[in-house]
């Protein structure tokens, strides 16, 4: 009888030990958010999805859009589509407040009018901080509304709020912050994959 009592006691202790250790194993896994590409929502919200004209070899410009993430996150990839071949297309992310370059990447556009995606080392973005995303090129897709009217900024595109569009005349070697704001067109196409991290 004493042996049976000892066995039951050991059995009870082992059940408690297993149940306590399994509590530690049930920690929730961190949430993994889906990647977002803000371009389609930007084009729809601005109306610039209505008309597109290819522009080739039309002088070199640094052009793009400013934006603020509404959540903390990161850029995981760059996406571009232009109407000409360019093996050294430079895409740049700027700090909009200081007008300084955060990161530049070169993308090889081997075929005209084909979307190219380049995975990059993730670039962390701070919630509500304004950034500028530009490309340096003499080719672009000029997107407008059919009636030529202006878009109203800001434009919400998921967790990214587009705050404006601008350009500046440049050279292939220069990286110059765009200061000529426009709201009647968008030259592109360039965008990124954004992923919320918290």
Stretch-by-stretch model annotation:
Residues 5, 50-54, 58-63, 103-110, ...:
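Sparse, context-dependent recognition of short Cys/His-centered cofactor- or disulfide-binding micro-motifs
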Residues 87-162:
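Aromatic- and Gly/Pro-enriched, solvent-exposed loop/edge beta-strand patches characteristic
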Residues 10-13:
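Short, linear, compositionally biased motifs with a strong N-terminal bias
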Residues 1-8:
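Bacterial N-terminal signal peptides that target proteins for export
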Residues 21-93, 140-198:
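Beta-sheet-rich sandwich/jelly-roll-like modules and their strand-loop junctions
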Residues 16-19:
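C-terminal motif of bacterial Sec signal peptides marking the signal peptidase cleavage site
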